[in-house]
UniProtKB/Swiss-Prot annotation:
This chain was obtained from antibody to type III pneumococci and was isolated from the serum of a single rabbit. The lineage of its organism: Eukaryota, Metazoa, Chordata, Craniata, Vertebrata. Residues 1-106 form the Ig-like domain. One of its GO terms (biological process) is adaptive immune response. One of its GO terms (cellular component) is immunoglobulin complex. It comes from Oryctolagus cuniculus (Rabbit). SUPFAM superfamilies: Immunoglobulin. SMART domains: IG, IGv. Keywords: Adaptive immunity, Disulfide bond, Immunity, Immunoglobulin, Pyrrolidone carboxylic acid. Disulfide bonds join C21-C91. The modification Pyrrolidone carboxylic acid is found at Q1. Signal peptide: none annotated. This is Ig heavy chain V-A2 region K-25.
Amino acid sequence: QSVKESEGGLFKPTDTLTLTCTVSGFSLSGYDMSWVRQAPGKGLEWIGVIYASGSTYYATWAKSRSTITRTSBTVBLMDSLTAQDTATYFCARGHTGLSYLKSSVDVWGPGTLVTVS
């Protein structure tokens, strides 16, 4: 059972980022899936989750600019980029929520670097 993010790359502010998380070995219909990011030198920052039911929930800062969707075997993140969004982006199985002490994540992707300049 694994998840893997698509390639990131170099973007400009106001670009729209689209990342795809491809899953293998399990069905998305049975799991919540989260997107998380980590800026250089910073801690993990939760972006949002798509629940097994298909409904979504976002961090307050991401609510107006991020969209998480899914297909049968992928989870997509779309985000309107700003200059502050350089980070490694991770897909994770489970719901990190706002507190990592209460995280239910059990599978992490390797991450993909997104540079905004």
